[in-house]
């Protein structure tokens, strides 16, 4: 029989040489140390802020310097775009998903400790919903302007959004270390356009760290107010963003507005009414660091076991299940609606099942994408995808190709048209093939409504004429022209149809301005418009995947371009192929591919005239029969080439 002897406590000293024993019993984990630091910092020493900037003005670089100075990351040359987690974010130099990081900072002037939450927001208008939720979690923002470029369209749009939400703004001019910059001129732009005091403007170099610790961090502490939440109130949190983890499900980025929440608490989402248990909770430092609790004013993450990102609705309120009746839902929730739709089909039709799985996984990580299966008579099985904008669609396609190696045929982007019927009913059309065409289908239609946007463009004055002509040719309506400074920068405002914006308007704008123009826009509602469906026909059969909805004034020009372009990619057949463009049951353009001729006379003697005529007549009849019953073989490469810009 085995006997066990329990050693007295005094014998523990003989294990001192075993480091692991001491660590296990006497030291705390890094997460516990962080939580202990947080507990010692009062709410009035919290500062939640974001950085407002145009693309390439140095937002990610400044974020890196702040993380280095506050010892979140080690200072080294590899720290580039730490908060940009996605490969496509790093390559394009843009922020797509909102991110956050907690920082601990000791003010050298007073010796007080502060908890800073940097909320890195997307800057592009496609992700404006995420931007507004991120700003709602902040007390202030750094308005970052490039000293070499000055104020740009995105700077203006995001400034007004932050200003409208009541954020305290700190104007900062970046890249002051460059020799060719005119800091005084940029200061004048900020003062004149945003009416911010010149003495409040701080000059920094995000790349070298110049003035970041000396001037910017003290300004964040002095000028940005602490969170206004109440720790004694019932818990409620604002859902800022989410991303999908294969093991955890949806990970939620939240701002704790009131109260506190702990691991294992039972919570409920106000919009979906779904109930959950908190599986994990913590801060981003800069990656997920579990702390076991979050309290008023903090920005961190929650894992609730959501299996689908669609359950995580941006702007939703999360509350304690036991105190639902005592808790007021946070205002301002608005469901995000897709504004750009495309048809997507596998470049190789046999890959549909595998690609369907890849597509579903990627959609799990982006709850703003809508996904429906559809079938095309030309391209086979595919999907109808809805996006927040053209950049959103481009990023999704790039991620699908890079992360999963999937190749797609993407149809021409379309926008949602509103059809108003004579009986007062309305229908939103997102697929051009479903758009009413011809006199019979349009007889019950009272009006068609087309979405418009208000575009803000900044550009050098020398390109003003070219840009105005571009806007006018795209059915634009001028709103305002503002001259930003004596150096020739102009801000131009136009109403434009959304359909023209998604048809590579930004590329055309860059072309006519030699890359110097910038663009931002916001929704301007629907207007009654004279739009029709344009179809491409091959031997009388419409190719559904290539249909488009256009304004009546553009139909003839686009139709002629279509038939000429498609003719280039269709191989000749043994019979004549007719390519036509049709709108309102009327053929507006036509191209013909002549039949490939087979020499049936090569074995005949030259003098056998009757036999010659008989064979030619038989060939003619055969081709006529083939044309009526034959199916034209158009390969996938032809569609890809035609849809390529």
Swiss-Prot record:
Listed under catalytic activity are: GTP + H2O = GDP + phosphate + H(+)
Family affiliation: Belongs to the TRAFAC class translation factor GTPase superfamily. Classic translation factor GTPase family. LepA subfamily.
Where is this protein primarily located?
mitochondrion
* Molecular-function GO terms, alphabetical: GTP binding; GTPase activity; mitochondrial ribosome binding
Q: Which residues form the tr-type G domain?
A: 44-228
| Function noted in UniProt | Promotes mitochondrial protein synthesis. May act as a fidelity factor of the translation reaction, by catalyzing a one-codon backward translocation of tRNAs on improperly translocated ribosomes. Binds to mitochondrial ribosomes in a GTP-dependent manner.
Instruction: Classify the protein's membrane topology as the record does.
Output: Peripheral membrane protein
| Gene Ontology biological process terms from the UniProt entry | positive regulation of translation; translation
Quick one: a GO cellular component term?
mitochondrial matrix
Give UniProt keywords alphabetically.
GTP-binding, Hydrolase, Membrane, Mitochondrion, Mitochondrion inner membrane, Nucleotide-binding, Protein biosynthesis
* InterPro entries with a match to the protein in the record: EF-4 (IPR006297), EFG_III/V (IPR035647), EFG_V-like (IPR000640), EFTu-like_2 (IPR004161), G_TR_CS (IPR031157), LepA_C_sf (IPR038363), LepA_CTD (IPR013842), LepA_IV (IPR035654)
Q: What is this protein called?
A: Translation factor GUF1, mitochondrial
Give the subcellular location.
Mitochondrion inner membrane
Q: List the disulfide bonds.
A: none
Q: Where is GTP bound in this sequence?
A: 53-60, 120-124, 174-177
- Where does this protein come from, organism-wise? Saccharomyces cerevisiae (strain ATCC 204508 / S288c) (Baker's yeast)
What other note does the entry give for this protein?
Present with 1890 molecules/cell in log phase SD medium. This protein may be expected to contain an N-terminal transit peptide but none has been predicted.
* EC number from the UniProt entry: 3.6.5.-
């Amino acid at each position: 029989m085995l006997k066990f002897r329990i050693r007295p406590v005094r014998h523990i000293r003989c294990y001192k040489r075993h480091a692991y024993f001491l660590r296990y019993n006497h030291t705390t984990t890094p997460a516990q140390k962080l939580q202990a630091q947080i507990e010692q910092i009062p709410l009035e020493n919290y500062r939640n802020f974001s950085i407002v900037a145009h693309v390439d003005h140095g937002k990610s670089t400044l974020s890196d310097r702040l993380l280095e100075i506050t010892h979140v990351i080690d200072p080294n040359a590899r720290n580039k775009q730490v908060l940009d987690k996605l490969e496509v974010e790093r390559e394009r130099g843009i922020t797509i998903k909102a991110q956050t990081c907690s920082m601990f900072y000791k003010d050298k002037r007073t010796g007080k400790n502060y908890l800073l939450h940097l909320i890195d927001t997307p800057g592009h208008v496609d992700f404006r919903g995420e931007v507004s939720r991120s700003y709602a979690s902040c007390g202030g923002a750094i308005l970052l302007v490039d000293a070499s470029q000055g104020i740009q369209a995105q700077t203006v749009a995001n400034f007004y959004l932050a200003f409208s939400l009541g954020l305290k703004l700190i104007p900062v001019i970046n890249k002051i270390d460059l020799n060719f910059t005119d800091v005084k001129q940029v200061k004048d732009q900020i003062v004149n356009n945003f009416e911010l005091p010149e003495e409040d403007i701080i000059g920094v170099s995000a790349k070298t760290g110049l003035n970041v610790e000396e001037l910017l961090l003290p300004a964040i502490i002095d000028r940005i107010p602490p969170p206004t939440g109440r720790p004694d109130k019932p818990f409620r949190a604002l859902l800022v963003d989410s991303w999908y983890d294969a093991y955890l499900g949806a990970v939620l980025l939240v701002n704790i507005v009131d109260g506190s929440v702990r691991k294992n608490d039972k919570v409920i989402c106000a919009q979906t009414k779904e109930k959950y248990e908190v599986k994990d909770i913590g801060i981003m430092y800069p990656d997920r660091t579990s702390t076991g609790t979050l309290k008023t004013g903090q920005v961190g993450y929650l894992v609730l076991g959501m299996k689908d990102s669609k359950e995580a609705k941006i702007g939703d309120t999360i509350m304690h299940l036991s105190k639902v009746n005592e808790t007021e839902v946070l205002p301002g929730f608005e469901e995000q609606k897709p504004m750009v739709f495309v048809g997507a089909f596998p470049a190789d039709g046999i890959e549909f099942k595998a690609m369907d799985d890849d597509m579903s996984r990627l959609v799990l990580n982006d709850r703003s994408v809508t996904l429906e299966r559809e079938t095309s008579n030309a391209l086979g099985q595919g999907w109808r995808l809805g996006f927040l904008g053209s950049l959103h669609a481009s990023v999704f396609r790039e991620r699908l190709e890079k992360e999963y190696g999937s190749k797609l045929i993407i149809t021409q982007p379309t926008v949602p048209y509103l059809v108003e019927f004579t009986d007062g009913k309305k229908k939103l059309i997102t697929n051009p093939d479903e758009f009413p065409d011809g006199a019979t289908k349009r007889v019950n239609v009272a009006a068609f409504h087309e979405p418009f946007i208000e575009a803000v463009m900044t550009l050098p004055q020398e390109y003003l004429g070219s840009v105005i002509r571009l806007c006018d040719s795209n059915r634009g309506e001028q709103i305002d022209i503002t001259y930003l400074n004596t150096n020739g920068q102009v801000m131009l405002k136009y109403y434009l149809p959304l359909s023209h914006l998604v048809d590579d308007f930004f590329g055309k704008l860059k072309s006519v301005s030699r890359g110097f123009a910038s663009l931002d826009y916001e929704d301007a509602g629907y207007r009654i418009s004279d739009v029709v469906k344009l179809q491409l026909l091959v031997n009388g059969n419409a190719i559904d995947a290539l249909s488009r909805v256009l304004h009546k004034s553009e139909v003839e020009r686009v139709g002629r371009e279509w038939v000429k372009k498609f003719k280039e990619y269709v191989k000749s057949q043994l019979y004549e192929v007719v390519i036509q463009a049709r709108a309102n049951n009327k053929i507006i353009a036509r191209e013909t591919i002549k039949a490939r001729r087979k020499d049936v006379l090569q074995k005949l003697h030259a003098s056998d005239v009757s036999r010659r005529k008989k064979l030619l007549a038989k060939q003619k009849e055969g081709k006529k029969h083939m044309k009526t019953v034959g199916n034209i073989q158009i390969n996938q490469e032809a569609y890809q080439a035609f849809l390529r810009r």
